[in-house]
Amino acid sequence: MTVININEIMTHLLPGQTIAGLDLGTKTIGIAISDMGLTVSNPRPVLQRKKFTEDAHRLIKIFDHENVGVIVIGLPLNMNGSSGSRVQATRAFVSNMKAYTKIPFVFWDERLSTIAAERSLLEMNVSRIKRARRIDSAAAAFILQGALNRIENLHS
């Protein structure tokens, strides 16, 4: 497993592979998977966090099932661009995943992704209870969609 730049994604993907998006929280992990054409991000059920080893095994199972070739993970920078404790936790998570997968990771600035996801769910009239259950995967989909749009712009 390695960390790559968004510009390198296409050189790491094999035909038919997808890209995963992750929104790492303290209690949950939001997950999204791209379509095969790498144009649309699709949210998946939220993973309730347990112990790291168990989380890693459950994620790897999902990545294998979805034929994931690259993982885009949200980097929760502060609004001024500085790194806080959540950035350190995200980097540590990716570093710890080295023992479980060779799939490369891409860090993606996730500032305002949860707010955008919340607005989107509100516009769809999703109830407060359902929003709470879906917000992290919606944020993961927002993160992944931003990366997919960037990839499309790089290759057009």
From Swiss-Prot:
Domain of life: Bacteria
GO BP terms, alphabetized: rRNA 5'-end processing
Alphabetical list of SUPFAM superfamilies matching this protein: Ribonuclease H-like (SSF53098)
Biological classification of the source: Bacteria, Pseudomonadati, Pseudomonadota, Alphaproteobacteria, Hyphomicrobiales
Primary enzyme class: hydrolase
Record carries keyword Hydrolase: yes
EC number in record: 3.1.-.-
PANTHER family linked to this entry: POLYNUCLEOTIDYL TRANSFERASE, RIBONUCLEASE H-LIKE SUPERFAMILY PROTEIN
Record keywords, A-Z: Cytoplasm, Hydrolase, Nuclease, Ribosome biogenesis
Main location: cytoplasm
Function: Could be a nuclease involved in processing of the 5'-end of pre-16S rRNA.
Name this polypeptide is given: Putative pre-16S rRNA nuclease
InterPro entries: RNaseH-like_sf (IPR012337), YqgF (IPR005227), YqgF/RNaseH-like_dom (IPR006641), YqgF/RNaseH-like_dom_sf (IPR037027)
Keyword presence, Nuclease: yes
Organism annotation: Bartonella tribocorum (strain CIP 105476 / IBS 506)
